[in-house]
Amino acid sequence: MEFKKFFKKRLWNNNSSLVQLLGLCPILAMTTNTINAIGLGITTTFVLTITNSIISILKNFIPKDIRIPIYMIIVSSTVTCIEMLLHAYQFNLYQSLGVFIPLIVTNCIVVGRADCIAYKSSFVISFLDGMSIGLGSTFAMFVIGSIREILGNGTFLFGANKIFNVLDHSFFFTFIDKNSTIILAMLPSGGFLVLGFVIAFKNYLDLGKKNCLKCFHSCKLKK
């Protein structure tokens, strides 16, 4: 197994958020702030990695006909344990993420990877798949959250002490004056716009400038 290709495929080429467009509800809801985006991304990564690993270990004992309900039991148990840990050790982050922690149970990425990969692959592949898919989703959330926070609030990493307890609550960067911010970026519609621009920029990087211009001109001629 070539680890570079393995991770590149999941982190970039087939990114669950920017290519497959899965799990968009929590992404759009929690990316108004970079720290919340990172927090939800890391939490989702842990859930993906742990559930993939458990299902891979138990795959020979899971009946094929009832595998989906069993996945849901494993995922919900994992999410509940992580939620309790956040409540105990990262209470500020727990409060910020709120209902979106238990909603990870319904995230189609988690059950999708469990059925497509963990149920059919070895422990190592399942573990690495869960981790890489989670990190890819975290990367997308971080980029979208950073753009929305800078444009809509004028700050970057505001509330970093929620994750990094060693930092002071005043640790953050200011890029834009409060009076010059774009409030649209903090609204759901702004979230969709930023997501669209990020996807377009990724496609531009993947396809290259020439292919994008060709596509643009061909669309123009058709009109």
From Swiss-Prot:
Keyword check for Ubl conjugation, yes or no: no
Chief subcellular location equals: membrane
Residue ranges spanning the membrane: these are 17-37, 38-58, 68-88, 91-111, 124-144, 156-176, 181-201
Alphabetically ordered keywords of this record: Cell inner membrane, Cell membrane, Electron transport, Membrane, Translocase, Transmembrane, Transmembrane helix, Transport
Protein origin, superkingdom: Bacteria
Which Gene Ontology cellular component terms are annotated? Answer: plasma membrane
Record InterPro entries = NqrDE/RnfAE, RnfE
| Assigned EC number | 7.-.-.-
Which GO biological process annotations does it have? electron transport chain
A Pfam family it matches? Rnf-Nqr
Annotated function: Part of a membrane-bound complex that couples electron transfer with translocation of ions across the membrane.
The cross-references to NCBIfam families, in alphabetical order and at most eight, read: PRK12405.1, rnfE
* Assembly and oligomerization: The complex is composed of six subunits: RnfA, RnfB, RnfC, RnfD, RnfE and RnfG.
Family, per the entry?
Answer: Belongs to the NqrDE/RnfAE family.
Q: In its UniProt entry, what is this protein called?
A: Ion-translocating oxidoreductase complex subunit E
Naturally occurring in which organism (per UniProt): Buchnera aphidicola subsp. Schizaphis graminum (strain Sg)
